[in-house]
């Protein structure tokens, strides 16, 4: 048996663009992807902190160090430029694997620069 666990998270990223006329996906700065352990074409869940929308899409790599967070295609209707979002990916692990696993959690500032990189979250605290 496997369970689904949080693998990677980019917390409070700022949407820099919303491109309705693109095929689909979310474009994420390749540097942020690498630091957060998110792969190109990986399925992610997006939570918009400003409006409460939750949806899934896949990732495409943006230019490294561009700080881009761009929702493309239909997903562009779910956000506004400037919204704060949480980007999460998940993995399937056995119970034994899950008990030893820690996700990669990336906290970013208003310009999508990394403030903190950790493998642990505690309720009410930024570790």
UniProtKB/Swiss-Prot annotation:
Give the primary localization class. Answer: cytoplasm
- Post-translational modification note: Is synthesized initially as an inactive proenzyme, which is activated by self-cleavage at a specific serine bond to produce a beta-subunit with a hydroxyl group at its C-terminus and an alpha-subunit with a pyruvoyl group at its N-terminus.
Name its co-factor(s): pyruvate
Q: Name the reaction it catalyses.
A: L-aspartate + H(+) = beta-alanine + CO2
The lineage's top-level taxon is Bacteria
Q: Name one GO biological process term.
A: pantothenate biosynthetic process
Enumerate the UniProt keywords alphabetically.
Answer: Autocatalytic cleavage, Cytoplasm, Decarboxylase, Lyase, Pantothenate biosynthesis, Pyruvate, Schiff base, Zymogen
User: Which family does the similarity line name?
Assistant: Belongs to the PanD family.
Fill in the subunit field for this protein: Heterooctamer of four alpha and four beta subunits.
Quote the PANTHER family the UniProt record gives: ASPARTATE 1-DECARBOXYLASE
Protein known as: Aspartate 1-decarboxylase
């Amino acid at each position: 048996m496997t369970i689904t666990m949080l693998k990677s998270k980019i917390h409070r990223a700022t949407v820099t663009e919303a491109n309705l006329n693109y095929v689909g996906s979310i474009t994420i700065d390749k540097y942020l992807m690498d630091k957060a352990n998110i792969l190109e074409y990986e399925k992610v869940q997006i939570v918009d902190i400003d409006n409460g929308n939750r949806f899934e899409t896949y990732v495409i790599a943006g230019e490294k160090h561009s700080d881009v967070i761009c929702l493309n295609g239909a997903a562009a209707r779910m956000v506004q430029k400037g919204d704060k979002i949480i980007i999460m990916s998940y993995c399937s692990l056995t119970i034994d694997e899950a008990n030893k696993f820690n996700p990669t959690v990336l906290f970013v500032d208003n310009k999508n620069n990394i403030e903190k990189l950790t493998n642990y979250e505690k309720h009410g605290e930024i570790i």
